[in-house]
Amino acid sequence: MYAYTVIAFLAASVAAAGNGPSISSLTVQQAANSCANGQSVYCCNKTSNKPAGNSVGDGAGIANGLSLFSQCSKVDVNVIAIANNLLNKECQANAACCQDSPGTAAAGLVNAALPCVAISNLV
């Protein structure tokens, strides 16, 4: 049940995406603003080719744009120097909006596969 809730929540993020600036000119703060409530910007070293919807039975097709990301670290948008930097300067890997997890270490690397929405799908 939890997995379906997460997928529905993240699918709403994809559906709400608008046409904004290109990913190469996006600041960290703009990226954070594109994430839904309860989500934050993460920089992830790995992403699976299999969409997250397939891991829980396709999610009735609502999981378009979702993927499983791993080896993620949270990008701190509360630091003004970081928030105003370009996203591609702060994250050379895969930038994504991921649901904040209570098990996430504040400054650590999250090794679990998280259902996330690539920021490039949101702008």
From Swiss-Prot:
Pfam families: Hydrophobin. Disruption phenotype: Does not affect pathogenicity in a corn seedling infection assay nor the production of microconidia, but affects microconidial chain formation. Induction: Expression is positively regulated by the cAMP-protein kinase A (PKA) pathway and more specifically by the adenylate cyclase FAC1. In contrast, deletion of PKA catalytitic subunit CPK1 has no obvious effect on the expression of HYD2. The keyword tRNA-binding does not apply. One of its GO terms (molecular function) is structural constituent of cell wall. Residues 1-16 form the signal peptide. It is found in: Secreted; Secreted, Cell wall. InterPro entries: Hydrophobin. One of its GO terms (cellular component) is extracellular region. Keywords: Cell wall, Disulfide bond, Secreted, Signal, Sporulation. Disulfide bonds join 35-97, 43-91, 44-72, 98-116. Its main location: secreted. Aerial growth, conidiation, and dispersal of filamentous fungi in the environment rely upon a capability of their secreting small amphipathic proteins called hydrophobins (HPBs) with low sequence identity. Class I can self-assemble into an outermost layer of rodlet bundles on aerial cell surfaces, conferring cellular hydrophobicity that supports fungal growth, development and dispersal; whereas Class II form highly ordered films at water-air interfaces through intermolecular interactions but contribute nothing to the rodlet structure. Belongs to the fungal hydrophobin family. This is Class I hydrophobin 2. It comes from Gibberella moniliformis. The gene is HYD2.
